[in-house]
Amino acid sequence: MKIVIVGCGRVGASVAEAYDQKGHEVLVLDILTAAFDRLPSSFGGIALRGDGTDEDVLKRAGAEGADVFLALTEGDNRNVMAAQLAAEELGIERVIAKINDPLRAKAYAELGIATLCRTGLMVDAIDHYLGFPSSGLPGMLAPTGHHEAHHDRASRPATNAAGSLTTVGGGQSSSESTTSATVPNAGPTTPQEA
């Protein structure tokens, strides 16, 4: 199974390692090169520095045709943007966005994005540990709304930014991985967004 992960923070790196060890084809994108230090030296997937909210970067990285797309950065808005691109523009059917804010998680699920709410999962885990009934704060929400795929670029305004991709590690390489271009507003460079 081909799995694309945007965000190589603690969660993203752990998920990437787990699915790599299970023998899946794993591609990890992050805007910070240092984020890939979290991956073990045994990681056999592809690690690319690039902006997962940039459609051109996702395409050049090889995200099209993925079986699963996981947006796991620390930024709710970045995760939703990446998830929407994956579902609507790349046509990936199984897309999950990690969301920290439970109110946003429900709203995004209504827009057709499956959400994984860390806050809800934590409350559920504490309830379970203490033997309490569930507080009702959802940890995982399936999409209740609908998104439409848009594959016809000719019908949309052209974008002027070609994102940058750089191979930073991993067991495989990509011929597109060394392509680079200047991107205005390439995004946050703090670990909180990685």
Locate each region found by the language model.
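Cytosolic regulatory regions of ion transport systems
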Residues: M1-A194
